[in-house]
Amino acid sequence: MDNYKKILVALALDPNSDRPLVEKAKELSANRDAQLYLIHAVEHLSSYGAAYGVAAGVDVEDMLLEEAKKRMNEIASQLNISSDHQIVKVGPAKFLILEQAKNWGVDLIIVGSHGRHGIQLLLGSTSNAVLHGAKCDVLAVRIKGS
């Protein structure tokens, strides 16, 4: 592997899914004196708004965003990652990850893979899109038991 200096970890904010990614990121950053960056995308809930009224979708989205920020801060504090090296935004994960990787100038993106069948199921649609859209290296870490 190259000498990575900026590593972006795309988190699901699920302890079982994130643990292997965080462990791999810690291992790689310690060996290379690299900076870690964290990202999580809260998907738009426009379909909920249509079904239950716009306010319902917006309220749920705001609640999910606040909860995600809280969980992200907990993970970041455990890893000693400053607030300017973490982001939680609303939008499609694949686009937000690629955009933020470019903005931060990262040289490695770490994503989770699920190990099912076929490339789409193996990586998942977000990981697959990141793999094919990234201008830097992408490391897919196997999520056991998913």
UniProtKB/Swiss-Prot annotation:
This is Universal stress protein A homolog 2. Involved in stress response. GO terms for biological process: response to stress. The lineage of its organism: Bacteria, Pseudomonadati, Pseudomonadota, Gammaproteobacteria, Legionellales. Gene3D superfamilies: HUPs. One of its GO terms (cellular component) is cytoplasm. Keywords: Cytoplasm. Pfam families: Usp (PF00582). Belongs to the universal stress protein A family. PANTHER family: STRESS RESPONSE PROTEIN NHAX, UNIVERSAL STRESS PROTEIN A-RELATED. Its main location: cytoplasm. InterPro entries: Rossmann-like_a/b/a_fold, Universal_stress_UspA, UspA. Coiled coil: none annotated. The keyword Cytoplasm applies. Signal peptide: none annotated. The keyword Cytoplasm applies. Homodimer. It is found in: Cytoplasm.
